[in-house]
C-alpha cells in the first residue's frame, strides 16, 4: 500500500523505465491502452515511449432517441482489432506492457465489459505481454458489469471483482475513489506472474538474479515508507480497509451510479447540448464543443462553464 494512486503509478513506472533503459538503451517503446489517464500518459512520455489510446468505435455512434440505452454499451472498451493490429505492426518486442483503465477515466468514466477485459488479456498474453490495470474505480466497473453484461446479474460485486482482477498481471489503484478513504493507493503484481517474469532477471540455471518485486519495494521504502504502511497513518489504513468492503455493497453503488444517470438525463431532457450518455458512475460530463456550438475558445470554454453563475 502507498499514500496515493499517483505515487503507486510513479513507483511502478520508474522501475519499468529503469529496467527497459538498462536492457535497451535509447529504444522507443509503444504502450497501448483503452484510454491512458493523464499521469500515465505523462509517465510513458517521460520514459521516451509512445502512449497509444485505442478507443472503442462505440464512442462515435449516435445516442438513441430519447437518450436511453436498454443496456450500457460499455463505451470504455478497448478496440481489440486495433490492439492486435498495433502489436503486430510495431512488433511484440516493442510493446512492453498493455494498460487498461477501469473505468475508462479519459472517456468520461465509461465502463469496460468483462468480455473486453478477457479479450485484452487474451491478445496481450498471446504475445507474452503483461496486462496492467489502472483500477481507481474497480467496484463501479463491476456494478456496470452486473447490471448490463449477460451472465453476471446474479453475481455480487465482490465475485465480479475477483474474476476481473484475475485477468491482470499487475495493477495500480488510487484508493480515494472506490476505497472510500481520504488517502491511499496500491501497486501490486501477480506473484511469479507474467509481469514478474518479464521484468525480473534470471541466471542461466533459472535462479533469480534481480527480482522486480524487490526493486519496487526498495523504491517505495526509499521514497514513501515501508510497504506495510506506505506513508499512511494507522487511522487511514483502517478507513481504507473498511472502505474497500463498503464499495462492494450493491445498494450503495446503485444509489451512486443512479444519481449520475438521473442528473445526466435531467440535463438531456432540459435540452442541454453535449451531455455524454449514458453517464458513468462518478460524474456527468458535457462536451464543450457541442455546448458552446464551437463559438468559445477551446482553451477556456470548460472553465467558463464551471465558473459562470446562472
Q: What positions do the PLM features span?
A:
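Conserved PLP-binding catalytic core of the aspartate aminotransferase-like
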Residues: 274-310
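Conserved PLP-enzyme active-site core in the AAT-like
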Residues: 2-274, 298-301
Amino acid at each position: 500500500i502507498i499514500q496515493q494512486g499517483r505515487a503507486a503509478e510513479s513507483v511502478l513506472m520508474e522501475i519499468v523505465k529503469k529496467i527497459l533503459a538498462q536492457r535497451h538503451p535509447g529504444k522507443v517503446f509503444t504502450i497501448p491502452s483503452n484510454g491512458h489517464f493523464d499521469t500515465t500518459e505523462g509517465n510513458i512520455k517521460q520514459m521516451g515511449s509512445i502512449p497509444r489510446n485505442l478507443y472503442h468505435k462505440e464512442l462515435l455512434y449516435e445516442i438513441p432517441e430519447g437518450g436511453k440505452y436498454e443496456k450500457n454499451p460499455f463505451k470504455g472498451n478497448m478496440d481489440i482489432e486495433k490492439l492486435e493490429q498495433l502489436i503486430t505492426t510495431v512488433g511484440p518486442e516493442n510493446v512492453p506492457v498493455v494498460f487498461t483503465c477501469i473505468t475508462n477515466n479519459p472517456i468520461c468514466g465509461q465502463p469496460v465489459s468483462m468480455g473486453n477485459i478477457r479479450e485484452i488479456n487474451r491478445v496481450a498474453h498471446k504475445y507474452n505481454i503483461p496486462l496492467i490495470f489502472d483500477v481507481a474505480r474497480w467496484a463501479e466497473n463491476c456494478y456496470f458489469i452486473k447490471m448490463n453484461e449477460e451472465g453476471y446479474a446474479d453475481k455480487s460485486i465482490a465475485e465480479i471483482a475477483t474474476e476481473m482482477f484475475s485477468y491482470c498481471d499487475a495493477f495500480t489503484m488510487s484508493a480515494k475513489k472506490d476505497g472510500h478513504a481520504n488517502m491511499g493507493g496500491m501497486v501490486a503484481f501477480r506473484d511469479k506472474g507474467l509481469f514478474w517474469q518479464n521484468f525480473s532477471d534470471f541466471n542461466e540455471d533459472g535462479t533469480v538474479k534481480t527480482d522486480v518485486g524487490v526493486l519496487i519495494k526498495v523504491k517505495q521504502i526509499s521514497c514513501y515508507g515501508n510497504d506495510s504502511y506506505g506513508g499512511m497513518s494507522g487511522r487511514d489504513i483502517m478507513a481504507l480497509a473498511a472502505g474497500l468492503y463498503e464499495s462492494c455493497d450493491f445498494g450503495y453503488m446503485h444509489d451512486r451510479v443512479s444519481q449520475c444517470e438521473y442528473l445526466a438525463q435531467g440535463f438531456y431532457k432540459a435540452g442541454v447540448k453535449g451531455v455524454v450518455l449514458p453517464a458513468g458512475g462518478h460524474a456527468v460530463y458535457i462536451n464543450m464543443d457541442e455546448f458552446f456550438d464551437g463559438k468559445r475558445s477551446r482553451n477556456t470554454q470548460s472553465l467558463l462553464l464551471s465558473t459562470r453563475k446562472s
